[in-house]
Amino acid sequence: MRGLRTACALAVLMDAGIASDLQAQERLYVVNQAGATISIIDQDRLVVDTVLDLRTLGFSPNAKPHHVVVEDDGSFWYVSLIGDGRVLKFDRGNRLVGQVRMETPGLLTLDPEHDSLYVGRSMTAVNPPKALGVIARTPFTLVDEHEIVIPRPHALAVSLDGQWVHTASLSENRIASVETATGRVRLTTIAGAPRSLVQFALSPDGRTMVAGGELSNTLLVFDLTKPPPFTPAREITVEGKPWEPRFSPDGRTLYLTLLTKNAVAEVDVATWTVRRTLDGKLAQPYGMIVRRDGRYAFITNQNTGAVMEGHSGHEMHGMAGMSASDGWLTVLDLTTGAVKTTLMLGNGPTGAGAARAR
C-alpha cells in the first residue's frame, strides 16, 4: 500500500509539473515601453496575471522594453531594453537569469535550429550600428555583432531551417540576408518608392515571408523556397500603415495591424486579397500575436493619438513631444470578427511574445 501511495503521489507531482509547464507555454508577454513594465497575460483565462516592474530589478525608468520572444516550451523568455542597452533573459518563473549589453537593441528572433538569439536595432535610434547582434541563448553571452551594411536594420526573421536570418532597413529598400553557416551577407534591393519594412512574418511551412511597408501602404510577399537575393513575388495595397503581420496556425490567413486605420486586415493567402477589415476598440494597433489554436488575436494598442500627416510611425514612436499613455490589449475573436474583451496594459505598449509564435 505504501508503494502504491508513493506512486500516486509521484504521479500527482508529475501531473502538476506538466500542468505548470503547459501554463508557462500559454502566457502572453507584452512590454510597456514608456512604463518600464511587462504585462504577463494568461491566454486561456484572458486576464493579466502579473505585471513585472523592471525598476524593481535595478533598471532605470527609461529602460524602454521594446520586444519579447519566448522559447517554444516556455522555459525562457527574452526582452530588449532600448534605453538601458540590454537584452534580458528570464526563466518561466519570471526570474532574471542573464543579461547582455548591446547598443539600442530592437526586435528579437529565435533561431529554431541553433542556440542563437538574433537582435536588431531600435527604430527610434538616430544612427544605430549597421550590425546584427548574435547571442548564444544557453550561456547567454554575446557571440558577435555581424556587420550587415544596411542602415537602421529593423524587420527580423530566421528561416525555419536556421540557414538564413533576414533583416530589412527602415530607411532603404534593402534586405540583408545572412547565411548562418558562413556569415556571408546577400543584399536584396527593392526597386521603386520607399517602403519602410516594419516587421517580417513567416508562414507555418516556412516557404513564404511577408512584410508590411508602412510608407508605401503595401504588403510584400517573398518566396523563401529560393535563396536570396529576393524579388517580391507579390505586392498588394493595404491602406493604413501596415505594421505587424501574423499568419494563422494553418497558414491560410494573414492578419496585419494597420497603425493609422485603427484596424486589422484579414488577408486570404490563397488569393492575396483582403477578405475583411476588423475594427473596434483599437487605437494605434501595434504588436500582435495569434493564439496557438487560431481562435483569438491579441493586439497591443498604443493609444497615443493619430500619426501626423507626412510622418512615419517610427518618427512618432517614443520620440520627444510624443506623450505615451496607458494602452490596452484587444482580444479579437477571429471567427466572428468581434472584440472578445480588452485588458488594460501599461504605458506605451509595443511588442508581444508567446511560445511558438513566429
Enumerate the language-model features and the residues they cover.
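Predominantly soluble domains enriched in secretory-pathway, periplasmic, or organellar proteins
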Residues: S20-R358
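Bacterial N-terminal signal peptides
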Residues: A7-G17
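Positively charged n-region of N-terminal signal peptides that target proteins for export
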Residues: M1-R5
